[in-house]
Amino acid sequence: MGVNAVHWFRKGLRLHDNPALKECIQGADTIRCVYILDPWFAGSSNVGINRWRFLLQCLEDLDANLRKLNSRLFVIRGQPADVFPRLFKEWNITKLSIEYDSEPFGKERDAAIKKLATEAGVEVIVRISHTLYDLDKIIELNGGQPPLTYKRFQTLISKMEPLEIPVETITSEVIEKCTTPLSDDHDEKYGVPSLEELGFDTDGLSSAVWPGGETEALTRLERHLERKAWVANFERPRMNANSLLASPTGLSPYLRFGCLSCRLFYFKLTDLYKKVKRNSSPPLSLYGQLLWREFFYTAATNNPRFDKMEGNPICVQIPWDKNPEALAKWAEGRTGFPWIDAIMTQLRQEGWIHHLARHAVACFLTRGDLWISWEEGMKVFEELLLDADWSINAGSWMWLSCSSFFQQFFHCYCPVGFGRRTDPNGDYIRRYLPVLRGFPAKYIYDPWNAPEGIQKVAKCLIGINYPKPMVNHAEASRLNIERMKQIYQQLSRYRGLGLLASVPSNPNGNGGFMGYSTENIPGCSSSGSCSQGSGILHYTHGDSQQTHLLKQGRSSMGTGLSGGKRPSQEEDTQSIGPKVQRQSTN
């Protein structure tokens, strides 16, 4: 009997730097590449149409690239635990390869499949390629616990062995005599389905701003590196209006779905830096997004409650308000704050928003204005963000809501001033909220302050054509900062830790925030400085402030455990949430 191999694609939707697939092909007589899709999840899971479209485009591109190698992608409907025993028998499989999945549900799923494979006499190959590092080794280096500060994480990885270089791309030379058995009805039995076949209504669906697939990912990588090359000092680009728009060099969804290897990106960045800087060693900051990605993956890998507040040992238990009406206004871009609403509109239409825009809407929903749980925001991002995955989405929301990782809760974004500073003319607002297009720049971020005559000329009456602000930012932010302060004081007493040492002695000052023109902004003083809760966040990652979170479990604020929801199948198979990196790939 020959060696019949199957490679199971989940994330890692690519032929470059795919060590599990490469090893699976070696010595095999036949190879079949499969992707298991449960159509039931398309209608029931919390995943929007833009994300499903991106996934299907990734699968179509993968199939097209396999065709060039006289192979095909086999898209199989069903559940892995039901599908594989049948395939093992039907195809006489002797070898199965998979990319290692670090997320708790993925590890549980893969353990079950490995057991089925062993019982069927099938060899299983598992290789790490969705992350740069072996996360278990990072945790081992840290005494068996994940590092909960970025500084500590950087210290740990600096002690690890150099990264392995990407493996060669799967080509006809790599495949050699390994063939793929194909039938005439392959498309009918194993073809990539359409959105319509999955039950989606595509009427009015605009063309994709982010086309899915490995081919697009590699094209974007070259553009991204060309852009980097002229930024000889590799500093962070300055934020401006154009930064808010989707870029043809953006990479985050492609890293998320594994269309682009993080290792390839890492080594391309390294090579470029050495070329520009004449062989000097690159700083860790060069790899901003990649390392933040690893940081959150490491924090989440052994914590199945990472996406929950209750029962999550690293999450502060905060008594958030339940307010479905306010949540819907935020999610649908109806808050009455044009900056917030434009961001949420872009997210719903295109599936992507700039990482600082993510910070702004996350702060507004949680500790800044609405006092709604980060879990609710995380679910909306899970539905709409192309680059949202389980670990990074949950980790980012905990971080931005001051529920974990740092506690500078007295720093907030002003939902008027931050946008005005970024895009003074308001072009971004006009693009995504055309109802406000007629307002002059002076009033486009706070149209409720425009005289009635200007509103009439703009053909937009506030409260009729566009909503009034749903909250008074000044009052809400002051109240919420006080709430946070009380929670952390209680937690400090409960754990016997001095967590509030960094709270400014003058909480009504602007605390060194960037200044905005703040006249007549709800929540900002007329003196020209942002009031409490109205500035830019300052990020700190002091180790001493984090130690209690490792052991906390349930604080005195907790209310017990709640049942976990199984991730959707689409979420299982691909898994960057709100961007928190110092250097963006967008």
Curated annotation (Swiss-Prot):
Gene Ontology biological process terms, A to Z: circadian regulation of gene expression; circadian rhythm; entrainment of circadian clock by photoperiod; gluconeogenesis; glucose homeostasis; negative regulation of circadian rhythm; negative regulation of DNA-templated transcription; negative regulation of G protein-coupled receptor signaling pathway
A molecular-function term among this protein's GO annotations: FAD binding
A Gene Ontology CC term for this entry?
A: nucleus
Cofactor remark from the record: Binds 1 FAD per subunit. Only a minority of the protein molecules contain bound FAD. Contrary to the situation in photolyases, the FAD is bound in a shallow, surface-exposed pocket.
Intervals of motif LIR 8: 379-384
**Region (Required for inhibition of CLOCK-BMAL1-mediated transcription), start-end ranges:** 371-470
For the motif LIR 10, what are the positions?
411-416
Per the record, which residues fall in region Disordered?
545-586
Motif LIR 2, residue range(s) on this chain: 82-87
Region Interaction with TIMELESS, residue ranges:
471-493
Is Plastid there in the keyword field? Answer: no
Q: Identify the residue span(s) of motif LIR 3.
A: 151-156
**Residues bound to FAD:** S252, Q289, H355, D387, A388, D389
Co-factor(s): FAD; (6R)-5,10-methylene-5,6,7,8-tetrahydrofolate
Residues spanned by motif LIR 1: 50-54
Q: Where is this motif: LIR 4?
A: 255-260
What is stated as this protein's family in its record? Belongs to the DNA photolyase class-1 family.
The record ties this protein, via PANTHER family, to: CRYPTOCHROME (PTHR11455), CRYPTOCHROME-1 (PTHR11455:SF16)
| UniProt function note | Transcriptional repressor which forms a core component of the circadian clock. The circadian clock, an internal time-keeping system, regulates various physiological processes through the generation of approximately 24 hour circadian rhythms in gene expression, which are translated into rhythms in metabolism and behavior. It is derived from the Latin roots 'circa' (about) and 'diem' (day) and acts as an important regulator of a wide array of physiological functions including metabolism, sleep, body temperature, blood pressure, endocrine, immune, cardiovascular, and renal function.
Q: What is this protein called?
A: Cryptochrome-1
**Organism of derivation:** Macaca fascicularis
The taxonomy runs:
Eukaryota, Metazoa, Chordata, Craniata, Vertebrata
Task: Tell me what gene encodes this.
Answer: CRY1
